[in-house]
């Protein structure tokens, strides 16, 4: 690595209410450097989306990225979107905080949830889900 030239990457955080997935790529997004998901750090399925799992994943991902020479990350947060919920799950905020705490420099934080301009018909039928 040359002096004065810092290597940056992009952390793609997909946070739903069932799981959290963190993928670190180069700036173009073409090459995956490291990735981690909730099932890789916790045993129970119900804990995959928890903030604790997100913190563990972020620590693992930050360590692997630092070994490859990356000093900072731009963060792209994504929720399921489209016909599902448009707010990120509980692991998103914890993952960003843990990345910063692990010594990675944080650049841009961007929400890239796919939002439809003319929504598809929601599931549940004409009268909706009756509870």
Curated annotation (Swiss-Prot):
A GO cellular component annotation in the UniProt record: ribosome
Superkingdom of source: Archaea
Keyword list, A-Z: Ribonucleoprotein, Ribosomal protein, RNA-binding, rRNA-binding
Coiled coil regions in record: none
Biological process, per Gene Ontology: translation
GO molecular function, one term: rRNA binding
Protein task: Located on the platform of the 30S subunit.
Similarity comment: Belongs to the universal ribosomal protein uS11 family.
Subunit description: Part of the 30S ribosomal subunit.
UniProt-listed PANTHER family: 40S RIBOSOMAL PROTEIN S14/30S RIBOSOMAL PROTEIN S11
Record NCBIfam families: arch_S11P (TIGR03628), PRK09607.1 (NF007176)
Record protein name field: Small ribosomal subunit protein uS11
Gene that encodes the chain: rps11
